[in-house]
Amino acid sequence: NSVSALDHDLSRHDGVDRYFVIQQGNGPLNSGTGLFVATTLTNGNYYYAVTTVVNGTEEVTLVPGANTLQIPVAETVSAPQPVFQQTRAVGSKTIEIYTNFISSKYAVGMPLMNKAGFIANDFILFRNNATSGKHPLRIRFHGGGGDFFLNSTSVQGDELNINPEHFLPGGKNAYWWGANENFNILDSDSNESSPINGVNYDFSQQQISRIINWAITNLPVDTNRIYLEGSSMGSIGAYFYALRYP
């Protein structure tokens, strides 16, 4: 759709529209650019097509070279990685902003986690001048009324700090868990009542796991000193994550 490339987290914080960077070193996508993210589940060659839905009816006519590929894309399964967006100054300190993209198609032969197709959330990394050695890592879950910029450079000693976000594109938050497969995460107002059936998927917690695994691989982190911190609603996020992924 017309806002699929919109970085909802950064736009909400800045109060103006910001768009995703999908390849490090490139600029953000242009306004109105369509974006769809799919994670390869099996090695192979893939063709993709784009269809449109008008007044509830999908136009499925395929025109090679126009709305469908003529040459397949060779894809290989690998662990999804966050995409660097930008650096910013918070006071006199530098933070880095990344985006985690999660495909709703998580397993071959299984239904989508959500009809939205993909879920994207940002997180902030404050390196605290750590370049080598082994440092503690703090994952900070913000409370209600705040966002992922809250206390992003507040650290103790030589620890690194990561502040994740969990808002859904429609404006609701995922309560650091996720959502039901039938919940419309793109348009909160369309959810007149809570879903009474379907599977509840923990894609927000999956994002936290990906962040931690990425940090262990790419940052000077002491794996014996990874801490979760939360205030108010963020306490729920830290507590629930520790219970599910001890």
Q: Locations of the language-model features?
A:
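N-terminal cap/lid segment of alpha/beta-hydrolase-fold proteins
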Residues: 75-133
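Short beta-strand element of the alpha/beta-hydrolase
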Residues: 127, 133-144, 153, 161-162
